[in-house]
């Protein structure tokens, strides 16, 4: 599925809107994600912090888990928006790789400006994928 510039911007805008709902009482670092499936559905996510820091959940994974819980497992594009255009953490990169190395990742800042566009494979070279399990 090809994504147009207008569709990219729409995903960035959805992620930016979602970002305002992030629960970040500790870091104040709001992250929003908008994930488009190959069937054309979109799922958003925000980061949710916890006083027990390791139990914090990233926006990207929230969007992925929402999609999977609704029966979607094939992804086309994910937009990630932070104030300064931060990229997905290692854990999110690994979870994204589970569902396809060709997923496009759009990284944008809080002004809605696209800063980077790359694939999961480019974000996580030599990813540990299900194929590595020999199944």
Residue ranges and their predicted role:
Residues 28-37:
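Short beta-strand scaffold segments in enzyme catalytic cores
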Residues 45-46, 118:
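Short hydrophobic alpha-helix segments
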């Amino acid at each position: 599925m090809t994504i147009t510039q207008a569709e990219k911007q729409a995903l960035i805008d959805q992620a930016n809107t979602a970002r305002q709902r992030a629960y970040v009482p500790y870091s104040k670092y709001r992250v929003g994600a908008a994930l488009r499936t190959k069937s054309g559905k979109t799922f958003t996510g925000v980061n949710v912090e916890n006083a027990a820091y390791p139990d914090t959940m990233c926006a990207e994974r929230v969007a992925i888990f929402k999609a999977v819980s609704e029966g979607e497992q094939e992804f086309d594009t994910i937009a990630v928006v932070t104030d300064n255009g931060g990229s997905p953490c290692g854990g999110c990169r690994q979870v994204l790789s589970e569902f396809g190395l060709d997923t496009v990742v759009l990284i944008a800042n809080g002004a809605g400006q696209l800063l980077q566009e790359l694939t999961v494979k480019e974000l996580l070279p030599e990813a540990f994928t299900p194929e590595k399990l020999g199944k």
